[in-house]
A protein has these predicted regions:
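Conserved post-catalytic alpha-helical subdomain immediately downstream of the catalytic base
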Residues: 123-124, 150-213
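Conserved phosphate/ATP/ADP-binding segment of small-molecule kinases
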Residues: 53-144
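Long hydrophobic segments that form regular secondary structure
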Residues: 40-43, 47, 56
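Flexible glycine/proline-rich, aromatic-decorated loop/lid segments
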Residues: 85-91, 132-161, 208-215
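Short, glycine- and charge-enriched coil/turn segments that flank and shape catalytic ligand pockets
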Residues: 17-22, 33-37, 103-111, 139-144, ...
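A short, flexible beta-alpha/helix-coil linker loop
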Residues: 14-17, 97-99, 152-153
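Conserved N-terminal subdomain of the carbohydrate kinase-like
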Residues: 1-42, 62, 203-216
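Active-site proximal loops enriched in glycine and acidic residues that flank catalytic Cys/His/Asp
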Residues: 45-46, 70-72, 92-96, 102, ...
Length: 216
């Protein structure tokens, strides 16, 4: 909407067919070669055919810090699942995706987080709740960590989860505490929702200024 500068509707056309076996094997080989040159792997699985069950299993076995966002959307609901992954260091989903994964819309979300974390053998599970902020469950300490939502103006939510995924992944990989990692990710997500799509990247200087102001 050019007047309100907010997103009204999105229309997508996607080829979500699976890759053939030869291309999939090439992808696995390429991934195995790449991890020797990098510090962490960030996976965004949108459920449109690029990452098959076999590729998800291959990713799960990579000997490197790995983070995952496997989202449910209108095109893949009922077909997409997190269960193809195991031993992921950091998983980020929203509360709707959490409840869909466990087929439970009534139970307390913290209990569901603990259950899903156990099923996936994930070290850190982050669940975003829109205006309710975000919760992180660490399976090693069995503690929950909380952070409020910081967004002042919401224009478009697309990309917020990706921004949070990137910042939390880098923070946890660098040895930050779960509280600090969740805080940094939430600040990045708040920046992201203030613009249409990914038209403007998360600004490092603004992020540092906001962080400095918040901790004073």
């Amino acid at each position: 909407d050019q007047i309100s500068k907010s997103k009204s509707i999105g229309v997508y056309s996607i080829n979500d067919s699976q890759m053939n076996g030869e291309n999939q094997n090439q992808l696995h080989t390429h991934l195995s070669d790449l991890i020797t040159k990098h510090d962490l792997v960030i996976v965004s699985d949108y459920g449109h055919g690029f990452i098959s069950r076999e590729t998800a299993k291959h990713i799960s076995k990579l000997s490197i810090f790995t983070s995952l966002n496997a989202q449910i959307n209108a095109a893949n609901i009922g077909y997409h699942t997190l269960n193809n992954y195991q031993n992921i260091d950091c998983v980020i989903i929203n509360e709707t995706e959490l409840r869909h994964e466990l087929r439970d819309r009534e139970s307390d979300h913290e209990e569901l987080m603990k259950e899903l974390s156990k099923n996936l053998q994930s070290k850190n599970l982050v669940v975003t709740q829109g205006s309710g902020g975000a919760t992180l469950f660490n399976s090693e300490s069995e503690k929950y960590h909380y952070c409020p939502a910081f967004a002042g103006k919401i224009v478009d939510k697309v990309g917020a989860g990706d921004a949070m995924l990137a910042l939390i992944s880098c923070s946890l990989k660098s040895g930050f505490s779960p509280d600090l990692g969740l805080f940094m990710g939430s600040l990045a997500a708040a920046q992201s929702v203030e613009t249409i799509g990914n038209s403007i990247p998360v600004n490092k200087i603004q992020l540092i200024k906001t962080f400095s102001h918040a901790v004073k």
